[in-house]
């Protein structure tokens, strides 16, 4: 049967009314729920909480701190790696010479180095090294010098206790105390030994052969003979005043 226009309108109106009723009921239910919440929490304003949870913030902060620590640790490690360790002894090269060794097949060339080592606090030593390359010869000389250290007396933290002469082969050396502020008066080879021993004011004089290695050995012979006044008094069974 064909449907009248009136019936069709009535049908649509019914559907719209039912839909409106369902909407109204759902809205009233939601309003009631919100009112209950407001009654329970009067401070609650019904705003949407956009701030993150405490757990999430703490996690993020921990992650940031961890990353920052990682960076700082790596930076500190790099800084420490770049830092050079402080050396106990200072080194000075006195002489480097090219040496030939004649063998059956011909000549063999090598390098010889003389190095002085000291801590500027009363310990000093010298060494001799020989190798096919200059760096290797210097390393050997440094090791030899560290194995041949001697301790020397220093008066007033600046000079030798008394005048001393020494001789090695054709080289002769004199060491003499100097007043404070005078400085080191010496040749290059003698200065290397005296500075690294810890003397800051001293007179020196060298005679005879100018061979650098022989002069260094003569200086070491003179340093070995140096004594404190107390030691000399004990050896002679005397008071320091009687010397």
Swiss-Prot record:
Gene name as annotated: rpsE
Assembly information from the UniProt record: Part of the 30S ribosomal subunit. Contacts proteins S4 and S8.
Name of this protein: Small ribosomal subunit protein uS5
InterPro entries: Ribosomal_Su5_D2-typ_SF, Ribosomal_uS5, Ribosomal_uS5_bac-type, Ribosomal_uS5_C, Ribosomal_uS5_N, Ribosomal_uS5_N_CS, Ribsml_uS5_D2-typ_fold_subgr
Domain S5 DRBM residue range list: 89-152
PANTHER family: MITOCHONDRIAL RIBOSOMAL PROTEIN S5
Signal peptide: none
SUPFAM superfamilies: dsRNA-binding domain-like (SSF54768), Ribosomal protein S5 domain 2-like (SSF54211)
Keywords for the protein's UniProt record, in alphabetical order: Ribonucleoprotein, Ribosomal protein, RNA-binding, rRNA-binding
Family statement drawn from the similarity comment of this UniProt entry: Belongs to the universal ribosomal protein uS5 family.
Higher taxonomy: Bacteria, Bacillati, Mycoplasmatota, Mycoplasmoidales, Metamycoplasmataceae
Domain of life: Bacteria
Extent of Basic and acidic residues compositional bias: 1-21, 34-46
GO biological process, one term: translation
Job of this protein: With S4 and S12 plays an important role in translational accuracy. Located at the back of the 30S subunit body where it stabilizes the conformation of the head with respect to the body.
Region span, Disordered: 1-85
């Amino acid at each position: 049967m064909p449907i009248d226009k009136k019936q069709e309108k009535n049908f649509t109106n019914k559907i719209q009314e039912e839909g409106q009723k369902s909407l109204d009921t759902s809205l009233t239910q939601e309003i009631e729920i919100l009112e209950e919440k407001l009654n329970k929490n009067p401070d609650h304003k019904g705003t949407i909480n956009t701030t993150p949870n405490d757990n999430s913030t703490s996690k993020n902060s921990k992650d940031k701190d961890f990353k920052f620590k990682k960076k700082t640790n790596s930076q500190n490690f790099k800084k420490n790696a770049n830092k050079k360790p402080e050396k106990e002894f200072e080194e000075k090269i006195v002489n480097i010479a090219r040496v030939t060794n004649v063998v059956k097949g011909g000549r063999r060339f090598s390098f010889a180095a003389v190095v002085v080592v000291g801590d500027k606090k009363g310990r000093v030593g010298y060494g001799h090294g020989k190798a096919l390359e200059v760096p290797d010869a210097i390393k050997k000389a440094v090791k030899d010098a560290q194995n041949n250290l001697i301790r020397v007396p220093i008066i007033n933290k600046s000079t030798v206790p008394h005048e001393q002469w020494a001789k090695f082969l054709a080289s002769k050396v004199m060491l003499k105390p100097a007043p404070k502020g005078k400085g080191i008066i010496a040749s290059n080879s003698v200065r290397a030994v005296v500075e690294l021993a810890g003397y800051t004011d001293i007179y020196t004089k060298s005679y005879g052969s100018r061979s650098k290695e022989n002069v260094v050995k003569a200086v070491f012979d003179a340093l070995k003979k140096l004594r404190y006044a107390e030691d000399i008094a004990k050896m002679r069974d005397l008071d320091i005043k009687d010397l």
